[in-house]
Amino acid sequence: QNGDVRLRGVPGGELKVDARIRVSSSDMDEAKKFADSIAIEISSTASGAMVKTRYPEGKWFFGSRRVSYAVDYDISVPEGAGVSVRNKFGDVTAENLKGGTEIHNANGRLTVRGGRGVARLENAFGALELAGNAGDADVTNANGTMTIAEVDGQLVARNRFGRVTIARAKKLDFSGTNADVSVSVSGPSSVTTSFGTVTVTTVNGDLKVQNNNGSITASGVTGEAELNGSFAPINF
């Protein structure tokens, strides 16, 4: 829940988990007791394996204000395994996962590279990057930039309050607000947003854009183009 998580897909069938516990306190004994109370649990399930962090309860959270803590994970998983992650207050990085990926994170950067299968990503209060996915992707971010490239499948993306850059998606459906949106070298695309600019270049198929209170610039569309806006120019 609190700490950075790094996941790597590797050949073979072995799961390897490295966990690093970090505790800071004005009292050394208190820090050591708290660290000793953190449990790293690894268990088998019907569908695979589960890794979970358990933190101590009671006075540590309600009576003491001097302890800060995190558990950082470096996890190697069989590259064909599906992965599900839930984290708070830390960065999450996933690379070379080929069995589908589901990640929910908050208050940190989320980066996924070189995946295959369906990717479901959700983040808040941090940047989100998806670079290379051989499959569909469903991506949601808030309060941070979104950068997506090389999605060989349908991309459904949502973002608020951060710049959005999307390149080379096989098919795109984007919705958002309060953000500048840039789309390039995509298949059929739909963009719905407000209070930001929309720039689209090179669409191999139809393009539909709805932008309120922001300009629209589009070029290189091979199919039909439907561009709707208000209170700002449209350039095509």
Task: Annotate each predicted stretch with a short phrase.
Residues 1, 228, 233-236:
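Short, intrinsically disordered, charge-balanced linker/junction segments flanking boundaries
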Residues 197, 215-216, 233-236:
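Short helix-to-loop capping/linker segments positioned immediately adjacent to catalytic or ligand/cofactor-binding
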Residues 4-87, 91-141, 145-159, 163-176, ...:
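Acidic (Asp/Glu) and glycine-rich low-complexity loops/linkers
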